[in-house]
Amino acid sequence: MNLTYNQFEILVAIEQRQNEKLTQRTLAKQTYVSLGIVNKVMEELSDLELITLKNNSTYELTLKGYEWLEPHRVKRAIFIAAGFGSRLVPITLNTPKPLIRVHGKLIIETLLDAVIDAGIKDITIVRGYLADQFDVLLKKYPMIKFITNPIYNESNNISSLMQVKDNLENAYVLESDLLLSNPRIIRKYEYTSNYLGIKMDVTDDWCFTLKKGIISKMSVGGENVFQMVGISYWNKEDGKKLATHIEKVFKKPGGKECYWDEVACKDYISDYKVMVRQCDKEDIVEIDTFNELKQIDKVYDI
């Protein structure tokens, strides 16, 4: 029951599009591999009896296909939503950034809807600034659990991860202020620990350098890198390690000022093999400033 990475990615892509006519070109675009690899892997999946062709280029997973994916199921989602969002003043003076409406929908809703559509029911939101306002989400999402970060305003986001450090196995960790346009990037299954990233020739933002597909460096700015997107997944083994490592970093001098992402991708990078899962810049947007918000939703341009 051991799938290669390419077999897994194409199997998941087919599972997401089972009722659609599906060309190999579509699969190549979604999985960021060549047509030749898609053709080869499709033959392998067919030979393994993991997929079957229904008609008119419509594929579906067999029972065996689902059984092979099951060990990779995502079990929970952790939302980090405690911060103030100072760069979006004045609107964040009265509203937490994840609860800002864009085109009539709360930013965090774009993520929550995708998580729920992926069958993930164990959902925790770590809140802090104007915490009670998040209760509005319970009407639509009664399954949500809230944890309050009491020191959000005197520490960096590692303090939010301290609140949930024992719940990171088989878990997505999501920044809650990302406006999601492509819900398919939130999936029922993940192959191994990974960060979402956008391939860039050059960026001045947080980014990853890769070595043989594994994150070898995390930095601010770089060339031929993947710009970091604030959605990651942690498998069972890495989730356990993170619980220990987050606490160690948090308790060291100056540890409260750290970004939690630095724990696995900088401080203890040799203990992890974290991949980058590629996405496009059109898939997801972080609205950093009030001017950017006005450009995206003209209702604020007054």
Walk through the language-model features, giving the residues of each.
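Short amphipathic alpha-helical interaction segments
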Residues: 32-44
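N-terminal glycine-rich phosphate-binding loop and ensuing alpha1 helix
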Residues: 14, 71-131
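A short, conserved structural fragment
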Residues: 46-56
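Short amphipathic alpha-helical interface segments
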Residues: 2-22
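Conserved beta-loop-beta/alpha segment of the NTase-like Rossmann-fold superfamily
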Residues: 135-206
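Conserved alpha/beta core of the MobA/IspD/sugar-nucleotide pyrophosphorylase nucleotidyltransferase superfamily
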Residues: 66-77, 228-302
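Short, cationic-aromatic polyanion-contact patches
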Residues: 3-6, 23, 55-72
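Conserved core of the sugar-phosphate nucleotidyltransferase
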Residues: 182-254
